[in-house]
């Protein structure tokens, strides 16, 4: 209603996204499972022994892991991909890895989170199907990307003369996409 009261000619919505929590059994109700966003925004406390699930494959995971390593946490990053930070560019990955390994990170590739059950984290190798149970985790951090926060766009659609939805509120992707969309919209109007 506040937006409508302004009687805008054009509304550009860029309300972002929220962390995506996949339907992994037990993850959504696990009291010690938090998102990488929670780590970076410091909205939740983090234990000493951290298991980090990097499903997204971007810098969100490596940045949050490095942030925790700088606090003296023991961090292990597990990913279903062939490498942690799979989508990090070839010129950026070597210095990221150098910093992480220099701070004591452990990494395991081709493992995915299968379930969280009564304090036990269950991982599965994506090739062999072998499952392992982990009971040595104080905090489980996950990074599965985002879910569009587009409620404002949907509420205003059809109620203003022109409306554009950009960035993660349109679809969670990289910062480059958000900048490109915002540039396109700015040139359009």
State the predicted function of each range:
Residues 21-22, 61:
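Short helix/loop capping segments that flank catalytic or ligand/cofactor-binding pockets
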Residues 1-21, 28-31, 35-48, 70-155, ...:
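A Rossmann-like FAD-binding core segment of flavoenzymes
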Residues 54-67, 71, 82-92, 151, ...:
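A conserved FAD-binding loop/helix module that cradles the flavin
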């Amino acid at each position: 209603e506040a937006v409508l009261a302004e009687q805008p000619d054009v509304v550009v919505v860029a309300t972002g996204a929220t962390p995506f929590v996949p339907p992994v059994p037990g993850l959504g109700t696990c009291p010690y499972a938090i998102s990488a966003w929670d780590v970076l925004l410091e909205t939740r406390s983090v234990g000493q022994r951290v298991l980090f699930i990097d499903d997204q494959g971007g810098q969100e995971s490596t940045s949050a892991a490095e942030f925790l390593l700088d606090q003296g946490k023991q961090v292990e990053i597990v990913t279903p991909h062939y490498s942690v930070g799979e989508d990090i560019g070839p010129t950026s990955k070597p210095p990221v890895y150098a910093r992480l390994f220099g701070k004591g990170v452990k990494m395991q590739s081709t493992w995915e989170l299968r379930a969280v059950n009564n304090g036990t984290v269950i991982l599965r190798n994506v090739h062999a199907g072998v499952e392992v149970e982990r009971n040595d985790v104080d905090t489980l951090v996950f990074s599965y990307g985002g879910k569009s926060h587009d409620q404002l766009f949907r509420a205003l659609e059809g109620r203003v003369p022109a409306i554009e939805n950009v960035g993660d509120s349109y679809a969670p992707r990289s910062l480059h996409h958000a900048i490109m969309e915002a540039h396109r919209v700015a040139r359009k109007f």
